[in-house]
Design a protein with these regions (language model features):
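SAM cofactor-binding core of SAM-dependent methyltransferases
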Residues: 85-132
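Short amphipathic alpha-helix with an adjacent loop that forms part of the alpha/beta core around
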Residues: 132-139
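A short glycine-rich, Lys/Arg-flanked "PGG" loop and its adjoining helix->strand segment in the class I
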Residues: 155-165
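Active-site capping/gating segments
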Residues: 182-221
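S-adenosyl-L-methionine
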Residues: 2-81, 95-98, 102
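Conserved beta-strand signature within the Rossmann-like core of class I S-adenosyl-L-methionine
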Residues: 164-178
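A short SAM/SAH-binding and catalytic strip from SAM-dependent methyltransferases
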Residues: 141-156
């Protein structure tokens, strides 16, 4: 890393901290402060906390692995984003949704997460809460998320039960459950959706892109 880059990152981190630190837990803020600069040039996948901060600071396109940029490109190609959307697991700072909102020509984006505390952010609608199968999704055209961990199962079941499209980039943690390996987890998800599809007539795909680390799930009519 050049000295110029190091200084620029420290400046952006200082500005970011001043503006947003009050919305973070102590441990999450410490993680961002410790890793924002020294992980910027990593070629591995980066924690969501850092992705949110880099996106807000306009740094995502400089990352070796721009996960948010890739996800936005794919969801725009694979889905119609012009409608009322719900992002589940947006994190502390919902910068992915803010960037996606700029690509919409109509519609709204609502973000939902139990850790979100910021009252206003761009043109987004904000819900502090945990997504469950009982969450009212009747107003949304599409539910989406990146690496939502424990919300994955609820998002899938909600999509089928409420006949709402889903676009989901899986994480690598297998939903916190103990599977023999990640592929066993994928087989479990596929079997679950096959059963739900047979009951509802809703279609699904599990697929991969080379610029995203884990598979994606899409449900649709």
């Amino acid at each position: 890393m050049t000295l110029e880059t190091h200084l620029r990152l420290n400046y952006l981190l200082s500005q970011y901290k001043t503006k947003y630190e009050k919305y973070y837990s102590k441990s999450d803020l410490e993680y961002v402060m410790k890793n924002f600069v020294n992980r910027f040039e990593d070629r591995d996948c980066i924690n969501n906390l850092l992705l949110q901060a880099y996106e807000e600071c306009g740094l995502s396109e400089e990352l070796s692995v721009n996960l948010y940029g890739s996800f936005i490109n794919h969801i725009r190609t694979d889905c119609d984003i012009n409608g009322d959307l719900l992002e589940v697991g947006c994190g502390v700072i919902p910068s992915l949704a803010k960037s996606l909102k700029r690509r919409q020509t109509s519609g709204t984006i609502t973000v939902m997460d139990p850790v979100i505390k910021i009252p206003e952010y761009g043109d987004l609608r904000i819900i502090n809460g945990t997504f469950t199968e009982q969450t009212d999704v009747s107003k949304y055209k599409l539910i989406y998320g990146t690496f939502p961990c424990e919300a994955t199962s609820a998002m899938i079941h909600s999509s089928y039960e409420n006949d709402v499209d889903l676009y989901l980039a899986l994480c690598g943690c297998a939903d916190g459950k103990l599977y023999l390996d990640y592929y066993e987890y994928l087989f479990y998800l596929e079997d679950t959706m096959e059963t739900l599809s047979n009951k509802t007539g809703r279609n699904f795909d599990i697929f991969e892109y080379s610029d995203l680390p884990y598979p994606l799930i899409k449900t649709y009519r």
